[in-house]
Design a protein with these regions (language model features):
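Short, structured active-site "lid" loops
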Residues: 62-88
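Small-molecule-sensing regulatory modules
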Residues: 2-54, 59-60, 67, 75, ...
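Extracytoplasmic loops/domains of multi-pass membrane proteins
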Residues: 73, 81-83, 92, 97-102
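Structured loop/turn residues at beta-strand edges in well-structured enzyme cores
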Residues: 85, 133, 174
């Protein structure tokens, strides 16, 4: 650590303000970033302040995301606070992040990625295949709903908004017989035992950037840039470069069922992607391999290949 860097480290008198949503999972993620920075720079807990910011997506629970504004509903107020100087960094679940950041902000720091798989959660059924004909399944994810409709068109799919705890309570109340959650979130909350088990990616390709935590900052803040460089996980960044370029080319939002996963194999990246009709009547999968250095171009190329196979009105 340089002497200049030492003078700019957070301290109890000038703590680093970490902006986050207020759900238990979001708070865990914010504190994980704090723990990583404490370990990397030998800092006390008092050198940080976690700032909870209410976002529209958490306040409106009775409507589908696509009907009230999509992914930006989970980030807009936090990014406004970052731009206004009310916080110094913002911690996000990357699968909730729009592909483009507002002018003045950059997202270039990621923690090591967690389990990317979806989890099958049901009080009374062990596997998806064991659900009876016509069973009610809750999900707010267009991707999961389309993938389920493709594999099990007999299922009744109902909207299932809310944080992990809210959705588990809905299951207990009998609103649905099963739901799907990200294994990463369950692992982080110490709730992995609530899942019947993970669903392998060959059966259900996950959301782009699922399991990844991203840290957003102001472009002009060189002090924070130096701090975050000390905890950035390069391999996760490389994987997300491919996945988010894939999503960007597809104009991905909460209105389009898109799945994608990049895996590093030696000096290569293997990117798998899938686009689906919202009603689950058609899926167009694909995959490409290429050098890690070309990760973003790989994502763009795979998206173009899938779009070329999609008929007009595919996402409608």
């Amino acid at each position: 650590m340089t002497a200049a860097m030492n003078h700019t480290l957070p301290n109890p008198a000038q703590p680093l303000r970490i902006g986050t949503r207020g759900s238990p999972l979001a708070l865990w993620q914010a504190h994980e970033v704090q723990r990583c920075l404490m370990a990397a720079f030998d800092l006390p807990e008092a050198a940080f302040a976690v700032v909870v910011i209410k976002v529209m997506g958490d306040q409106i629970q009775d409507r589908a995301l696509k009907d009230i504004g999509g992914k930006g509903l989970f980030t807009r107020e936090i990014e406004d606070a970052l731009l206004d100087g009310g916080i110094d960094i913002a911690v996000h679940s990357m699968k909730d992040m729009p592909t483009l950041q507002p002018d003045g902000l950059i997202l270039d720091c990621y923690l090591p990625r967690e389990d990317v798989r979806d989890a099958f959660v049901s009080p009374g059924v062990a596997r998806l295949a064991d659900l009876p004909q016509g069973a009610v399944v809750g999900s707010s994810s267009l991707r999961r709903r389309a993938q389920l409709a493709l594999r099990r068109p007999d299922l009744q799919l109902v909207e299932f908004r809310g944080n992990v705890q809210t959705r588990m309570r809905k299951l207990e109340e009998g609103v649905a017989q099963a739901t799907f959650l990200a294994m990463a979130g369950l692992n982080r909350l110490g709730m992995a035992h609530m899942a019947r088990g993970p669903i392998e990616v060959e059966e259900m390709l996950p959301a782009v950037a699922q399991g990844a935590i991203g840290i957003e900052r102001r472009v002009s803040d060189v002090r924070v840039e130096a701090l975050l460089a000390g905890i950035h996980h390069t391999a996760t960044g490389q994987r997300l470069a491919a996945e988010r370029a894939f999503l960007l080319k597809l104009d991905g939002s909460c209105e389009t069922p898109i799945a994608g996963l990049a895996v590093i194999e030696g000096d290569q990246i293997w990117l798998r992607g899938e686009i689906l009709r919202p009603d689950g009547t058609q899926s167009i999968p694909g995959a490409l391999r290429g050098p890690i250095a070309d990760a973003a171009a790989l994502g763009t190329d795979l998206a173009a290949q899938l779009l070329a196979q999609a008929p007009n009105g595919f996402f409608i």
